[in-house]
């Protein structure tokens, strides 16, 4: 049985198009066809083919948003349901709501730019682009599927391409970084499988793993706490949460520029999305008790990673720890019981995806010219690479949350949402906000000092001998320009993004607040006994644009 339900479709034809299935299958089928693409030996035809596939995928996701997605609805849209293995409860079920649609668009957008960033790759280009396209389909599937077993399969599918992209095209320690990545991520994925099976078979009868069926089940509080803890570990590795983060600096330290963009731009967001989708939406009673822990872990992420970034002399590792620090705001937003704070967490994921991808692409472009990642060996290249310096400066300012940039809006929404969240006691809110503010202060210090060490001062003798200290080429300017357009656009007018998911966030927060009200004895005195009312509408957050 095949069912389509494209809510909000603008025309009858759009209502019959399986947009999300196409966005998953086009890159996967495109990857399977890569071995059959004729090539003259330099990989040129394969590059253009892969770029075409990623652009088609991006256009499909944009068409899905324009023709079949209605931001004013909070429920599931673009639904597709095909009975697969009914005896085992397996169904091909995909759909999109405010939690997933923005991330689907982000995935297809960044992957198309990563494909363009991979243009200089000359070693085994056929295999490289095969893995890149397979990863694209797997990541879109993570956000689009509506069945927990399918989610697990998609989660595992994208791990294999990342492992091979690290192990084959990475740096000197690529085998170590790739092995550490797969051990952390694949090992923690076992908790997802166990939780999926436990939740699917809960209550007896025919098992069902669809999100709607799981949300309708009345899980006991002890069962919810156990599943929540396991899923928190699995998703905490991918986010990542300190101390489950150590794979990320090693992976970033050895990855190439396009893999950097996919890791920072998309992979980390899978952890944040999964926390909202499963821990908050399907296990609300457990979330009401774990939320203070998420807040504390978020502060640890912000401060610890910012301080560690200070000590890094390797450019890639410095930006990697900066990413971990910024993802701490996602944890605080997810742990808040306010629509504004949770909306800020969602916007922070999108904002960091764009900013992180731009910074890591610039790291790769800089390494191609200087052939070093050590800040001690850099300096004085600003005169020879003025455009590159300008691109670095704008992206660094975006990362330190300059007003008018998307990072400023998202972090301010998290702060404002948590600070005004009456679900927590006032002393707890004051302490958390003050500690998180320390990370905000540290960020411009280590980012601006990094720019000074790269571009200012006296040029090192080792760099003088290089003849390839050329300025940014048009391809590089185009990639950064494409990333800066939404960064600045969201910073100046946040409703460009917040309107696409505000209704879903309100519904999610309302569910969590309802669960908190049913808890008669909170796990800690950090949470008040009485929950506040859910904010009525979150269309345009009251955040200054500049």
Curated annotation (Swiss-Prot):
EC number, as in UniProt: 7.1.1.-
GO biological process assignments: ATP synthesis coupled electron transport; electron transport coupled proton transport
InterPro entries: NADH_Q_OxRdtase_chain4, NADH_Q_OxRdtase_chainM/4, NADH_UbQ_OxRdtase, ND/Mrp_TM
Catalytic reaction(s) noted: a plastoquinone + NADH + (n+1) H(+)(in) = a plastoquinol + NAD(+) + n H(+)(out); a plastoquinone + NADPH + (n+1) H(+)(in) = a plastoquinol + NADP(+) + n H(+)(out)
Compartments where located: Cellular thylakoid membrane
Membrane-spanning segments: 17-37, 48-68, 103-123, 127-147, 149-169, 181-201, 222-242, 256-276, 290-310, 327-347, 348-368, 389-409, 430-450, 477-497
Gene Ontology cellular component annotations, sorted alphabetically: plasma membrane-derived thylakoid membrane
The keyword Mitochondrion is annotated on this UniProt entry: no
Molecular functions (GO terms): NADH dehydrogenase (ubiquinone) activity; ubiquinone binding
Topological category with respect to the lipid bilayer: Multi-pass membrane protein
Keywords recorded for this protein, A-Z: Membrane, NAD, NADP, Plastoquinone, Quinone, Thylakoid, Translocase, Transmembrane, Transmembrane helix
Entries under NCBIfam families matching the protein: NDH_I_M, PRK02546.1, PRK12561.1
Family: Belongs to the complex I subunit 4 family.
Job description of the protein: NDH-1 shuttles electrons from NAD(P)H, via FMN and iron-sulfur (Fe-S) centers, to quinones in the respiratory chain. The immediate electron acceptor for the enzyme in this species is believed to be plastoquinone. Couples the redox reaction to proton translocation (for every two electrons transferred, four hydrogen ions are translocated across the cytoplasmic membrane), and thus conserves the redox energy in a proton gradient.
Protein name: NAD(P)H-quinone oxidoreductase chain 4
Species, as recorded: Parasynechococcus marenigrum (strain WH8102)
